[in-house]
Amino acid sequence: MTRRVFARGMMLAAASLTTSSLLSACSTAADAATEQASLPATGANDGGAEGTEPLTATEFLFDTVITLTIYGTQEALDAAIERCRFFENTFSRTVEGSDVWRINEAAGQPVEVARETADIITQALAYCEASEGLFDITIGSVSSLWDFKEGVRPADEAIAEAITHIDYRGVSVEGTTVQLSDPQAKIDLGGIAKGYIADDLKQLLAEQGVESACLNLGGNVAVLGTKPDGSPWNVGIQDPNGSAQDVIAAVPCTNGSVVTSGLYERQFTEEGVLYYHILDPRTGYPVVTDVVSSSLLTDSSTDGDAYATMLFLMGRDEALALVNEDDRFEGLVVDNAGEITLSAQAPFELF
C-alpha cells in the first residue's frame, strides 16, 4: 500500500445507503493499533467518584455493537444508553411503531413525529438537495427489498419498479408533521442516522457535565474533548482486507468525529456475483466503485456519515478531490488495489 495525495477541483456527488456497521474504535492509549484488538467488555465498569476512571457500556443497537466510554457519572452513562434506545425505536425502518415505520406505512398520509425525527429528516433533505438527489433518503423503497443478512437478491423487475418511488422532493416536513407525496415511497435514514445520534449524544453528555468521552457507534466514532491527560483520542481504522481487529491507520481526534464506511461490512455472493450493502439510488443495485473503504475526520458526525458513503459513488480520485476542497473534512480512502490515499492535510498515521 502506498500513500498518495490528490488535489483537484471539487466535484459534487453523493450516494444513499443502508446502515453500516464497520468496527472503528477509540483508543485510551497512545497506540490505537494495539487497543483496537481489545474493545471494552460488555456492561459498565465502576468509575471513580470524580470521573477519574472510565465508565464503559456496550450494547447491540442500530444493528451493530456500540461502545460508550465516558469519564463521568453512572447517571450520565445510563442517560446516554437510554437515549440510544430512544433513537433505535424512533429512527429504525424495521422497528414496528417507530416514526420512520409509521411514515412508510401511512401511504402518503401526514404523520406526527418526534422533534428529533423531523430534525433529522430536515437535515437529510438538505444533503439530498445539495447532491441533486444522488443522496436520497427515499431509497427505502429499494433498500427494503435487499436482505444482506440472509443473502436475498431482489428480482430485477422489483428493483425497476421500486426506483420509480425514489424522489426526496416528495418528502415534506411541517413542524413535526412528515408526509410523503408518493404513497409507495419509503424513507431509510441509514445514511445519516448514526452520525446524527453521535452528535446528539455528545451534546447530552456535555449537558451532564462530562468533558471526556469516546462514543463508538460501529463505524461512527465521536469523541468529547480530550482524554483525561489532555492528549487527543486515537481512533483506529480497520483494514478492509483484514479481520475486524486489524488496523491500517489511526488518527488523533479532539472533540470531533471519525466516520468510516466499507464495502465489506455487509455482503453476500449469489451465482458467483458479490453484492455489497451500499446501494446506488440511481440504479437500485449495489454501487460500482473502485473505493473499498473511506474514512473522514470531521467536527460533525452527521456530515461525516452522509459524506463517507458518498465517496463510494464518486470513486477514489473524485472523492479525494472533494475532501481536499471541503474544509470540513480530512480523509483516507482505500481502493480496490489495496492502495491508501490521503487528503492533502490528513493527520492519519499509517501502520
Say what each PLM segment does.
Residues 1-351:
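Mature catalytic core of soluble alpha/beta enzymes
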